[in-house]
């Protein structure tokens, strides 16, 4: 087990180093001003339009109060907006603003550079094996 933990630790440090290198190479100041949870919410809203706070908290497996606080922060910063459901006026949908869409593009660019720099050194078989391991991890949750 020690070898596995050592390898995993080395991978974690490699990931952190790649992250730093890419941040130093580009202007990711908008992205860096947000916490991981905020970015995750923006990515989720890109994938699923018209989510409510409850649906978002279910997707992210996070308490609704935590998500509502993050939503308020993102609304205040202009990344998302609330839109009232025409059929049920008590329900509010969450939508990305133009600023939110732009930040998601910045995140996609960063993530692509990051993943390419990390995975490019692995051969195809290793990439497939890692994908299989990650897929199994999802099944365990």
Which role fits each region the language model picked out?
Residues 1-4, 125-141:
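C-terminal regulatory/oligomerization modules of transcriptional regulators
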Residues 53-54, 65, 72, 92:
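Residues within helix-turn-helix
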Residues 24-63:
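N-terminal helix-turn-helix DNA-binding core of bacterial DNA-binding proteins
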Residues 43-47, 108, 135:
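Short, locally clustered residues in the helix-turn-helix/winged-helix DNA-binding domain
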Residues 72-128:
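Charged, amphipathic alpha-helical coiled-coil/dimerization segments
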Residues 15-22, 26, 60, 103, ...:
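Alpha-helical linker/hinge and terminal dimerization helices associated
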Residues 1-32:
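N-terminal leader segment of winged-helix/HTH proteins
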């Amino acid at each position: 087990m020690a070898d596995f933990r050592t390898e995993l630790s080395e991978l974690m440090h490699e990931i952190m180093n790649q992250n730093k290198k890419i941040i130093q190479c580009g202007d990711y100041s908008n992205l860096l001003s947000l916490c991981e949870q905020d970015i995750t919410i923006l990515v989720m809203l890109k994938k699923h339009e018209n989510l409510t706070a409850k649906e978002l908290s279910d997707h992210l497996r996070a308490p609704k109060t935590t998500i509502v606080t993050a939503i308020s922060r993102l609304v205040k910063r202009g990344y998302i907006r609330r839109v009232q459901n025409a059929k049920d006026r008590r329900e509010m949908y969450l939508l990305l603003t133009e600023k939110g869409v732009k930040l998601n593009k910045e995140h996609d660019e960063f993530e692509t550079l990051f993943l390419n720099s990390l995975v490019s050194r692995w051969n195809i078989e290793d990439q497939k094996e890692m994908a299989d391991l990650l897929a199994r991890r999802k099944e365990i949750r």
